[in-house]
Amino acid sequence: MVGGGVAAFDCSGDGLPELFLAGGAAPSALFLNRSVKAGQLAFEKTLTGVEVEGATGAYPLDVDGDGITDLAILRVGENQMMRGLGNCRFERANEAWGFDGGDAWHTAFAATWEKGADWPTLAVGTYIDRTQEDFPWGHCTTNWLIRPAPGERRFAPGAALEPGFCSLSMLFTDWNRSGTPALRVANDREYYKGGQEQLWHIAPGEAPHLFTEVEGWARLRVWGMGIASADLDGDTYPEYFLTSMADSKLQTLKAGPGKPAYADVAFKRGVTAHRPYTGGDIRPSTGWHAQFEDVNNDCRADLFVAKGNVWAMPDFAEKDPNNLLLQKEDGSFEEAGDRAGVASMATGRGGAVVDLNADGALDLVVVNRFAPAQVWRNSGQGLGHWLAVKPQMPGPNRDAIGAWIEVRAGDMTTRRELTRGGGHVSGQLVPWHFGLADQTEAEVRVIWPDGTEGPWQRVAADGVWVLSPGAEPVAWAP
């Protein structure tokens, strides 16, 4: 019903991301990327140690800071932390890392590194109580915050994030650029009682607690299924897109960083995505995975939304095509899913917008319910130049989660927050992609997780660059 995620990450070292697909009742699988660089896409299913039943989704991250990607697998039942061994081999690490995988219907995940920590902090979201299948309403289960054990490189027992309101997406995000991320939680109003969307204070050394209406957080009730974030208006603060049934939301800060008070600008921007735009079904849509990426390399973030009916819900569209919303010069978006060829009528869930063949054009993966997953190669004509950034830093947080990347190309400046979480049970660990339009070079800098601002550095377009603190950019090639 929910779940069906995909994780994209390069575990073979060839610069082409592999795909982990959650299998639900069937075993999950890892597909090695055998694509031709800048050519046809091809994948090979391979036994790697991640084949588990009951998987709902997965997120790649380097938990132990050894430079090898690990994988957090969400499941109906016990979650599994899989330690990367190199060459796309994995082993269970729950016991070695002190990770309590729980025994619930797990449907959301996020990770961050708190200040001074040498081990990540995780948030894990759960859905309805599986013992209440006959009457699930009002039976949402507990979410968890899992922090490092003091003085040890392992996890401490989790702290309950209560109340839980049937979470389907989580994201650690520095919403006000304070240097301390908070935790956003998207919740499904179908099953909770008295619930709402949530924003948690997660301050180092302090117990988590919710932002309140007194602090500016307004009650919002949606069928929250996915979160995507991007700075769309150039004010340095992220906007948040929330998928739902019927109209989706696009939230922007009302009056700066003083309080988390948001205005919904989805209608103004043209991203409500509230009903199908092709196929003849006019009932309300159901949105799942969402992701901002520049798919035509014009320096403007576009938006992909995976669509699909929950489970024979007659009041909602059965033929519900995915959205590919291209951002225009005025900041509004226009639908391009039909002419791009991605308006599938399959029942979509998780997804990934990612460069699968190292040609600088972002491709698309969607996991479907009751149908095979779909992969689309980006064969668009007239795409702009591009740049991909691979931040690397010494210490435990090697991939600089919590940093910001800023890119100046001509008179355009774009920025991205480096997060791990969000979407719908689908995560990626790949170089961060920026379109450059007609620019053949750009200036780039990283604002590192501790707030240190790296210098602006000039790099050539159409390549991947490694940025590290105190070092010159290095062109990366496998």
Can you name each region flagged by the protein language model?
Residues 3-13, 32-33, 55-65, 69, ...:
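Beta-propeller blade termini
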Residues 27, 78, 139-142, 194-196, ...:
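A detector of repeated loop/turn-to-beta-strand junctions in beta-rich toroidal repeat architectures
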Residues 117-122, 126, 152-153, 206, ...:
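Gly/Ser/Thr/Pro-enriched helix-cap/hinge segments flanking short amphipathic alpha-helices
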